[in-house]
Amino acid sequence: MIPPEIRRSVLLQKAIKLALAGTLLTFASFSATAADPSSDTETPQPPDILLGPLFNDVQNAKLFPDQKTFADAIPNSDPLMILADYRMQRNQSGFDLRHFVDVNFTLPKAGEKYVPPAGQSLREHIDGLWPVLTRSTKNVEKWDSLLPLPESYVVPGGRFREIYYWDSYFTMLGLAESGHWDKVADMVANFGYEIDAWGHIPNGNRTYYLSRSQPPFFAFMVELLAQHEGDDALKEYLPQLQKEYAYWMEGVETLQPGQQNQRVVKLEDGSVLNRYWDDRDTPRPESWVEDIATVKSNPNRPATEIYRDLRSAAASGWDFSSRWMDNPQQLSTIRTTTIVPVDLNALLYQLEKTLARASAAAGDRAKASHYDALANARQKAIEMHLWNNKEGWYADYDLKNNKIRDQLTAAALFPLYVNAAAKDRAAKVAAAAQAHLLQPGGLATTSVKSGQQWDAPNGWAPLQWVAAEGLQNYGQDDVAMEVTWRFLTNVQHTYDREKKLVEKYDVSSTGTGGGGGEYPLQDGFGWTNGVTLKMLDLICPQEKPCDSVPSTRPASLSATPTKTPSAATQ
């Protein structure tokens, strides 16, 4: 039986068959014009809308261990025809749903297990993985949920067969470190293409990810490319930077104090900040059954509200974390859309500063001043509303209760990362992180053990890099060294035992991959590879780079992070 809260997706099939058929024709033409983002195409529909009750029934039948499998399956013919056949056959005696799926869909192939050559150092292993993780989808099948991209790209690994937005920046750090500037340029071009095609960078290049974005790292990507190409990169991608900013700020002009619209929030004092948001409020196709179960566990809340908050947490990249929940042990208390995240607003500060720099490079001083003013206003709002003076760290703002939240998370390091923190406050954040988050194997995401993957005891490579670089920005080199050395030791010990790098690590010790979440631990792994290479160069002298973590801990970090040219330490 289809849950009432998603019945509209099913009824849509009956009510607008002609319109949907038109959408399918548009989708067919879309794949043929993938390299031309200027072509006027409608947004392709995700599989839960294309397949309606069939999608719901397959996912609820749990035919596959991973719900993402059927979301990524490719219809072998027109989905409307498959759906019509399903309606006719499903009530017949002896109907076999799995057989029907096997006949009518091409399931994603399991990736061949990569066996690295014996005796490789950590650096050699990572360098050998780049071609293994590289994909090209310039052309895709007509009804594939995969969205084509004009250039090749590097995927995270494991079950993740597509490109992901914020993952990619940390992967690109490693590509640059390995000298693959051509791949860095290709990936920036792909994200620029997505902005032109969809008005934003989606969570990933799948139709079911189009309704949301992820932490906005495109400005950092362009700044990274500018290290190699100079200001030409800034000037080339200025239009896309402006479009991404417009996406995050959509509706701000009409907001009154105390109002919110999609991704933008205006507080009672007129301060403008942002939140995570997904345009849809139904179960995620890639986690269909899990989301329905979460909703059923809390019948006192509107289902659509929970669905949107689950989706918005996926947009945050932290899916899931006690950070978004009223009760850390109950996922259905999630309320991402009523929380103003400190890391998101730090990243948008960086976007504003990059827009100012790019505008200046293009000779538009007026625009540069405009974006600088927006960045300064955001910085003041961060200091005013996202600083917990009682606790002594940056935190998220609670729109529901109109107050700063008390929880310390690794997101507190983001204002340091973008050079937006006051120096005295940066010192307090460093002390808090060292006292409450630093563990033997690196920096814990939070201090809460909820069973969710973005909580203790897990540590994630991107947050280690944000912390290490942010701490160095403010002269907190000792704490930066602790984070760097402990995490690298964890990565090295795991690699020595298992000959792989993984998505996340248990930082309560060293040598163990992380747990929790909706799927098994994944290896590969794009952002861990990138951060590991960058950190190896932090602990080893530039004149004598190391290929593995040294047996003896260095006295200090050997290199300083690349300062963001558009931001200055306060």
Curated annotation (Swiss-Prot):
Chain spans, region Disordered: 544-570
Positions annotated to bind substrate: 159, 166-167, 203, 212-214, 284-286, 317, 518
Signal peptide residues on this chain, from the entry's feature table: 1-34
Source organism per UniProt: Salmonella dublin (strain CT_02021853)
Subunit structure: Monomer.
Record-listed E.C. numbers: 3.2.1.28
Keywords: Glycosidase, Hydrolase, Periplasm, Signal
HAMAP family from the UniProt entry: Peripl_trehalase (MF_01060)
One annotated GO molecular function: alpha,alpha-trehalase activity
Enzyme class, UniProt record, top EC level: hydrolase
Catalytic activity: alpha,alpha-trehalose + H2O = alpha-D-glucose + beta-D-glucose
Function statement: Provides the cells with the ability to utilize trehalose at high osmolarity by splitting it into glucose molecules that can subsequently be taken up by the phosphotransferase-mediated uptake system.
Cell compartments where the protein resides: Periplasm
Positions of the catalytic residues: 319 (proton donor/acceptor), 503 (proton donor/acceptor)
Low complexity bias locations: 554-570
Protein name (Swiss-Prot/TrEMBL): Periplasmic trehalase
SUPFAM superfamilies: Six-hairpin glycosidases
Chief location bin: periplasm
Cellular component terms (Gene Ontology): periplasmic space
Domain of life: Bacteria
Record family assignment: Belongs to the glycosyl hydrolase 37 family.
Taxonomic placement: Bacteria, Pseudomonadati, Pseudomonadota, Gammaproteobacteria, Enterobacterales
GO biological process: cellular hyperosmotic response; trehalose catabolic process
InterPro entries documented for this protein: 6-hairpin_glycosidase_sf, 6hp_glycosidase-like_sf, Glyco_hydro_37, Glyco_hydro_37_CS, Trehalase_periplasmic
A Pfam family hit: Trehalase
